[in-house]
């Protein structure tokens, strides 16, 4: 089967654990996920099956939205509730206005130091593997894009934020850095991913929904089409001749203003055909093809 599942990951399960369960339920080897979540986090994780896995890379540019609960007054070595407590300070003097006034510093393009408990590599070794050995190393700062932070409430010591961000953002690092800015320390208490590009929590499936569909023989019915992953790309409808060239691996030329990094191609019958990318000579090359070439007719 080919398609996408918008899964609501439960707490305590790794992202690869979700993939493993989907692989087992669908009896399919080619399964991958579009964005890792920490085991303690919950929420949206898109899972790709079959040929749809070829589109995972196009999700790297989409925005994500998180609901975060941050507890002030305590720091942990993992920056979240899973780690060992490393510091405690009073936060009784912290007010909601103080939190609001600190938030603008975290908007726009910021730099973050990845937590030691992260998948970032140091000299070929995952940081979390070093952290589990009690080894802490200097980490290079990384850029992150924060598009919005909504203050949802503060009942000391816990504050609630909704954060819209780009690829590679560590919400745990935002919690840690915010605590440092407020002078009391903080850690990420809970995290829910509410959206991942076109995939939203309100339309997600629990793993129990997959099991129910399996029992009813309706696993194919709950799959989203592969093109659901590229809905954010510019869309273009092409004639049969152009699509035939693309599905046969040939470039095409287009009369258009502007040049996006990629476009989703559809046929006149609204069939998803390919993703194309521009070349330096002005042509467009098929990066991913989803229609099969028409068989050649035998000569009379």
Swiss-Prot record:
Pfam families: TruB_C_2, TruB_N. Keywords: Isomerase, tRNA processing. The active site is at residue 38. GO terms for molecular function: RNA binding; tRNA pseudouridine(55) synthase activity. Its EC number is 5.4.99.25. InterPro entries: PsdUridine_synth_cat_dom_sf (IPR020103), PsdUridine_synth_N (IPR002501), tRNA_psdUridine_synth_TruB (IPR014780), TruB_C (IPR032819). It is an enzyme of class 5 (isomerase). GO terms for biological process: mRNA pseudouridine synthesis; tRNA pseudouridine synthesis. It catalyses: uridine(55) in tRNA = pseudouridine(55) in tRNA. It comes from the Bacteria. Responsible for synthesis of pseudouridine from uracil-55 in the psi GC loop of transfer RNAs. Belongs to the pseudouridine synthase TruB family. Type 1 subfamily. This is tRNA pseudouridine synthase B. It comes from Dehalococcoides mccartyi (strain ATCC BAA-2266 / KCTC 15142 / 195). The gene is truB.
